[in-house]
Amino acid sequence: MKPARELTAFMDRLGYVFEDPALLARALTHSSLSSPTRGDNQRLEFLGDRVLGLVMAEAVLAADTDAKEGTLAPRFNALVRKEACADVARQIDLGAAMRLGKSEMSAGGRRRMALLGDAMEAVIAAVYLDGGFASARDLVLRLWSERVQSVEEDARDAKTALQEWAQARGMAPPTYTEVARSGPDHAPVFRVRVTLSSGENAEAQAKAKRQAEQQAAKDLLAQLAGE
């Protein structure tokens, strides 16, 4: 088990104090370190995914009471996808608290998007089991607040607009490529390039990959409008 001080430090970053710290320890334990006497976070990940989904479904419904299902679904998906969970995990430096086996440690597991996203969902489940749905809901809404606002502001976002522009001209959908990543593991900066099948492209950078993609799409739309 992680030393108590390390769990306490992570609870400070998380903004939630566990009545049962063993739940948090389990949520932070990857299967590469599990054993018959020490479980991993896979079952908690399964539960946390459902808790996150319910909270986000409520959030997108509350944010736009007139929106139809067809417009709500993309917003919901943007909030619950693994990349979003991993971004939140990086913000609270969850990677530093993860308990990994030697193989995952040497493979850079603390930085891997899939592992971070899974662990974030497991932590949500641990909070749910420790303090109930209200505690889990408060945690998720606090950690996802900027994303919820951003998704609502970008209900018809630049990526969608660029894709529609391309489709209207019989072109393939735009492609997005991560061309660079800098900064510390817990606060990376992503640089992304968007490219049309006709060759036009633009690059942008941001602290979240989705934001970089949005900005690149916005810049390319502006470039196309000026032609």
Curated annotation (Swiss-Prot):
<keyword id="KW-0507">mRNA processing</keyword>
<feature type="binding site">
    <location>
        <position position="45"/>
    </location>
    <ligand>
        <name>Mg(2+)</name>
    </ligand>
</feature>
<feature type="binding site">
    <location>
        <position position="118"/>
    </location>
    <ligand>
        <name>Mg(2+)</name>
    </ligand>
</feature>
<keyword id="KW-0699">rRNA-binding</keyword>
<dbReference type="GO" id="GO:0005737">
    <property type="term" value="C:cytoplasm"/>
</dbReference>
<keyword id="KW-0694">RNA-binding</keyword>
<keyword id="KW-0460">Magnesium</keyword>
<dbReference type="GO" id="GO:0046872">
    <property type="term" value="F:metal ion binding"/>
</dbReference>
<keyword id="KW-0540">Nuclease</keyword>
<feature type="domain" description="RNase III">
    <location>
        <begin position="7"/>
        <end position="132"/>
    </location>
</feature>
<feature type="binding site">
    <location>
        <position position="121"/>
    </location>
    <ligand>
        <name>Mg(2+)</name>
    </ligand>
</feature>
<dbReference type="InterPro" id="IPR011907">
    <property type="entry name" value="RNase_III"/>
</dbReference>
<keyword id="KW-0255">Endonuclease</keyword>
<dbReference type="GO" id="GO:0010468">
    <property type="term" value="P:regulation of gene expression"/>
</dbReference>
<protein>
    <recommendedName>
        <fullName>Ribonuclease 3</fullName>
        <ecNumber>3.1.26.3</ecNumber>
    </recommendedName>
</protein>
<feature type="domain" description="DRBM">
    <location>
        <begin position="157"/>
        <end position="226"/>
    </location>
</feature>
<comment type="function">
    <text>Digests double-stranded RNA. Involved in the processing of primary rRNA transcript to yield the immediate precursors to the large and small rRNAs (23S and 16S). Processes some mRNAs, and tRNAs when they are encoded in the rRNA operon. Processes pre-crRNA and tracrRNA of type II CRISPR loci if present in the organism.</text>
</comment>
<dbReference type="InterPro" id="IPR014720">
    <property type="entry name" value="dsRBD_dom"/>
</dbReference>
<comment type="similarity">
    <text>Belongs to the ribonuclease III family.</text>
</comment>
<keyword id="KW-0698">rRNA processing</keyword>
<dbReference type="Pfam" id="PF00035">
    <property type="entry name" value="dsrm"/>
</dbReference>
<keyword id="KW-0819">tRNA processing</keyword>
<keyword id="KW-0378">Hydrolase</keyword>
<comment type="subunit">
    <text>Homodimer.</text>
</comment>
<dbReference type="GO" id="GO:0004525">
    <property type="term" value="F:ribonuclease III activity"/>
</dbReference>
<dbReference type="Pfam" id="PF14622">
    <property type="entry name" value="Ribonucleas_3_3"/>
</dbReference>
<keyword id="KW-0963">Cytoplasm</keyword>
<dbReference type="GO" id="GO:0003725">
    <property type="term" value="F:double-stranded RNA binding"/>
</dbReference>
<dbReference type="GO" id="GO:0006397">
    <property type="term" value="P:mRNA processing"/>
</dbReference>
<dbReference type="GO" id="GO:0008033">
    <property type="term" value="P:tRNA processing"/>
</dbReference>
<feature type="active site">
    <location>
        <position position="121"/>
    </location>
</feature>
<dbReference type="InterPro" id="IPR000999">
    <property type="entry name" value="RNase_III_dom"/>
</dbReference>
<feature type="active site">
    <location>
        <position position="49"/>
    </location>
</feature>
<keyword id="KW-0479">Metal-binding</keyword>
<dbReference type="GO" id="GO:0006364">
    <property type="term" value="P:rRNA processing"/>
</dbReference>
<dbReference type="InterPro" id="IPR036389">
    <property type="entry name" value="RNase_III_sf"/>
</dbReference>
<dbReference type="GO" id="GO:0019843">
    <property type="term" value="F:rRNA binding"/>
</dbReference>
